[in-house]
Every structure is written in structure tokens, then in C-alpha cells.
Design a protein with these regions (language model features):
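C-terminal structured domains
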Residues: 231-328
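Short amphipathic alpha-helical segments
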Residues: 8-16, 72, 76, 80, ...
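N-terminal alpha-helical "arm" segments
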Residues: 1-39
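Short low-complexity stretches enriched in small and charged residues
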Residues: 3-5, 220-235
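Residue-level signal for secondary-structure boundary elements
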Residues: 28, 92, 96, 186-190, ...
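Basic, alpha-helical nucleic-acid-binding regions used in initiation and control of genome expression
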Residues: 7-9, 25, 79-86, 290-292
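Charged, alpha-helical interface segments at or near domain boundaries
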Residues: 31-227
């Protein structure tokens, strides 16, 4: 977003924060409305209005970008304000707001911690405010995955340094807890891309999780491409940082394997059978990132392989483009 557009959108957000109370029910009479400029993944900035009710621990944020575009296209202000008010009410009534979790209490949130993988260079500013672990050119951060009992919404909260101080917990303990948790976002899935495509077009079929102990890898071992994510397909690229997942991948692909960063939600596993070179794979990743992946969901422009001695992923030098990366 260029500076002029961001300023105009922020002015609009300030007018929303000032007047939106007039479009909301009586319970919002004493609510506080504050304009927030949020730094998302890979430097993407979004402007929203935060709603704070005295009796609530969670303060939903409604982003105003799409509503600002409606105004610029000529939609009546009153109509757009009513739409914003409706979004605020829905956010305030979402299951995660009333699930009894207090973000200020570590004991309340610790079982809902999970790990997210982001690009270090593209998130330098954000990472200054967050506890993180460096893994090659990537960084692991923690977030709270608020549970929901329906499909009405999803909420997460990235853990910042200020949270650790408030919780009186160190980063090492938090990361250990996050990786030990058993919620769906911590449950890895490895699927053959061939099976996944067949299951999409065949409603009766389904792709097998090849990490399950009772699955016969057998005939699937000759496939060229596999997708690794988690059950919820949310920030599933972090599964590649789990030691037990890497150990299982080493068993399935004893000849070695490459890791292609599809997005923050998924990585692709390519067996190292000598048919694909890191340079070619790196070019493929950059092409897909440029044309197919939303900027804030891009993980990396590089390819990784598995270091059997260190039991972790490492960058493949031949896959690295010799120009500035991730600065789109």
C-alpha cells in the first residue's frame, strides 16, 4: 500500500472510530473504538478499528480496507457504516470471544499455543517485538490459537515480548509448551499430491496421511511430490520444524528430500531421486510466489534439504537467487 492510500484509509478509519457508535446497539454505548495499524506477515500493513468492551478480555479488530474501497466506488456512507457495524457485532459474538480464555493469563492460554514459521528478512521489524527462534533464513514464532466450537470464525494472537513479561514466562518454556500441545494445528499431515488431486475430483475419495503408523507407504513411494501441513491447514509449514516429523520423513525418503516453501500454511516435499536440481526447484518456488501466493502468505524464495547429521533443514545454495529476495 503506497503512503498516500494508507493516509486516506487511516483518515477513513478515524472517522469510523468516531461515528460507528451511532450504528451499533446500546451495549456499545460505553465501548472504546481505536484505530489500529497492524503489521502482518512479510511487512503487509492493515488498518482497522479495535472494539473494546469493558467486560471482555478479547478486543476484536475490523479491518476497513474493503469498506474504504466501497466508499471510493460511490457506495453511500450510511450503507457502508451499517456493514461495518454488522461486522463488529459478529466479531463480538464470535465463539472465541466467549470461550473463557484470558489472554492476560498464561495458564489460560498455554494449552492453545502453537508455532508459526515466517521469513526472517521480510519480518525484521515485527520480529523485534516477538520472541523467536531462527531456523536458517526463517524464524519460528508462537501464537495463541483460540478454539472455536463452530465455523463462524477463527482468531489467533501472535505472542509478543510484552506477553512474556506479563505472563512471567521465558521464551524457551513457551516454545516447549507450544510444540507439546496436541490441538489440530499441531497434528501433521503428509499427503501425496497425486492422491490429493484425485480426492478433489472424486467426492468419495480421500488423501491418506502418510505419517500414520499403520499406512503402507509402498506404491506411493514413487510419487514426485507430497504436501506437508497440519489438520487445519493453518500455518502448517511449521510442521517441518518438528523433530518427530523430520525423523518420519527421513524414514520415508532415505535417499533424502527437498523442502519447497509453498506458503506459511504448507511445504512441499520432493524426494531427492536425482531428477530435480535445487536451482530448478528454486526457480519454480519464486515463480509460484510471484504469481500464485498472497504476499503475506509467502514463506521463502529458497529451497531446503534435510541435514541428516544435524537433523534439521538447511538452505540449498544453488536454489538462492543472486538478488534481493522477499522484498516485493
Amino acid at each position: 500500500m503506497i503512503a498516500r492510500e494508507m493516509i486516506a484509509e487511516k483518515v477513513f478509519a478515524e472517522s469510523v472510530a468516531k461515528d460507528i457508535r451511532n450504528f451499533l446497539p446500546e451495549k456499545y454505548e460505553n465501548a472504546e473504538f481505536q484505530v489500529m495499524q497492524m503489521n502482518k506477515n512479510n511487512g503487509v500493513q492493515m488498518i482497522g478499528v479495535q472494539v473494546r468492551l469493558q467486560e471482555e478480555n478479547v478486543c476484536p479488530v475490523v479491518y476497513v480496507g474493503s469498506f474504504f474501497n466501497e466508499i471510493r466506488l460511490g457506495e453511500p456512507v450510511e450503507k457502508v457504516m451499517n456493514e461495518i457495524a454488522k461486522c463488529m457485532e459478529e466479531a463480538g459474538n464470535a465463539p472465541f470471544v466467549h470461550n473463557g480464555i484470558n489472554p492476560m493469563d498464561y495458564d489460560s492460554v498455554k494449552e492453545h499455543l502453537a508455532v508459526m514459521l515466517v521469513n526472517t528478512q521480510a519480518n525484521k521489524r515485527m520480529l523485534q517485538e516477538m520472541p523467536h527462534e531462527n531456523i536458517e533464513d526463517l524464524s519460528a514464532i508462537c501464537y495463541v490459537d483460540f478454539p472455536v466450537e463452530s465455523n463462524d470464525g477463527k482468531a489467533t494472537m501472535k505472542v509478543k515480548n510484552e506477553h512474556l513479561k506479563m505472563w512471567n514466562v521465558d521464551a524457551k518454556e513457551m516454545f516447549h509448551q507450544a510444540r507439546a500441545n496436541t490441538q489440530p494445528v499441531n497434528t501433521p499431515i503428509l499427503q501425496s499430491m497425486d492422491e490429493m488431486m484425485l480426492s478433489i475430483f472424486n467426492e468419495e475419495g480421500h488423501a491418506t496421511n502418510l505419517l500414520d503408523e499403520n499406512v503402507d507407504f509402498g506404491f506411493r513411494s514413487h510419487d514426485m511430490l507430497y504436501a506437508l501441513t497440519n489438520v487445519e491447514k493453518q500455518y502448517g509449514a511449521s510442521m517441518i520444524t518438528q523433530p518427530e516429523v523430520l525423523n518420519k520423513l527421513e524414514q520415508l525418503f532415505p535417499e533424502g528430500f527437498y523442502v519447497l516453501p509453498s506458503s506459511v500454511h504448507e511445504v512441499l516435499i520432493v524426494p531427492d531421486n536425482g531428477e530435480m536440481e535445487p536451482k530448478m526447484l528454486g526457480e519454480m518456488v519464486r515463480e509460484v510466489n510471484k504469481n500464485e501466493v498472497e504476499r503475506q502468505e509467502v514463506l521463502s524464495d529458497r529451497v531446503y534439504s534435510y541435514d541428516k547429521e544435524k537433523h534439521q533443514i538447511r538452505q540449498e545454495p544453488d536454489s538462492i537467487q543472486q538478488v534481493k529476495e522477499m522484498g516485493r
